[in-house]
Amino acid sequence: MSSQFEQLKLLSVLVCDTGDPELVKSSESQDATTNPSLILKVAQEPKYQELLTEAIAWGIRQNGDDVQTLTFVLDKIQVNFGLEILKHIPGRVSLEIDARLSFNTEAMVQRAIFLSELFAASGGDKKRLLVKIPGTWEGIQAVELLEKQGIACNVTLIFNLIQAIAAAKAKATLISPFVGRIYDWWIAAYGDDGYSIDADPGVASVSNIYTYYKKFDITTQIMAASFRSKEQVLALAGCDLLTVSPKLLDELKKDQSPVERKLDPAEAKKLDVQPVELTESIFRFLMNEDAMATEKLAEGIRIFSGDTQILEAAVTEFIKQIAAQDV
């Protein structure tokens, strides 16, 4: 019997969720995803100093003011790590724009275009880049504009169906619903009632989105994310893509138990699902009605924003050190 990893690869595209290029290399995955939190964990490791220092030097050479230089450096760090990651996989990498722009459509569009152009200018193939945009109303409007310009988007921080429907209407390439964070909210709110994996709220949320998409022939891909256990991953076998931490990927490689398809487009077609009307007011009302989605979206933006600021502080210190050496 082959490993669960190999069996799962026959049902879903497996994606490695990390900022560490070496872990991507050993993951044997098709694609990779990263974010400021993941890059922060590895950016200051000695083995990646060259990626960091090159980004800082490049940013300084752009001759912007202090704020512009910091923006240049942060995006170049992402690009450098993204390109390094792409050396080890055949598919795509997802890079994220600054979460502090989450409620400014125009700013997100401009930043995503800059990131995409910087990626290409640094030697990357735009076809292998997904730009991660948060699943706010403003973010999804940015996605619609970006997709029309040929910039493929990954709508992240998806916590309920109305976000997924809005992203599909915007013709997003891909969405990332967060299994584990949904599960975390339910446990924190109502306690651990020993959810069976079939009743896991995070798994159920992604399953519902999958059913809706396949029922109505929506081409936007679903990449389930933020897993807390191998069991959650296996419960979504058949989802278009699964982005999984290196730790859980290793667990899948060590287990040879049978893997069963859980999500099937043909089965989704048979279900009685009604289309949901979408307007901005409906989106905002249904988000407001969903305490979990509202709270986890806000929390996710705060976490990514906070980690970006920590990374900024570290980069600022590096810039000061370089400036002092040049004096």
UniProtKB/Swiss-Prot annotation:
Record's function text: Transaldolase is important for the balance of metabolites in the pentose-phosphate pathway.
PROSITE patterns: TRANSALDOLASE_1 (PS01054), TRANSALDOLASE_2 (PS00958)
Keywords per UniProt: Cytoplasm, Pentose shunt, Schiff base, Transferase
Reaction(s) the record says it catalyses: D-sedoheptulose 7-phosphate + D-glyceraldehyde 3-phosphate = D-erythrose 4-phosphate + beta-D-fructose 6-phosphate
Species for this entry: Chlamydia abortus (strain DSM 27085 / S26/3)
GO molecular function terms noted in the UniProt entry: transaldolase activity
Lineage of producing organism: Bacteria, Pseudomonadati, Chlamydiota, Chlamydiia, Chlamydiales
Metabolic or biological pathway: Carbohydrate degradation; pentose phosphate pathway; D-glyceraldehyde 3-phosphate and beta-D-fructose 6-phosphate from D-ribose 5-phosphate and D-xylulose 5-phosphate (non-oxidative stage): step 2/3
Assembly and interaction partners: Homodimer.
UniProt-annotated location(s): Cytoplasm
PANTHER family in alphabetical order: TRANSALDOLASE
Single GO BP term: pentose-phosphate shunt
Protein name: Transaldolase
Entry's family note: Belongs to the transaldolase family. Type 1 subfamily.
Active site positions: 132 (schiff-base intermediate with substrate)
InterPro entries per the UniProt record, alphabetical: Aldolase_TIM (IPR013785), TAL/FSA (IPR001585), Transaldolase_1 (IPR004730), Transaldolase_AS (IPR018225)
Record GO cellular component, one term: cytoplasm
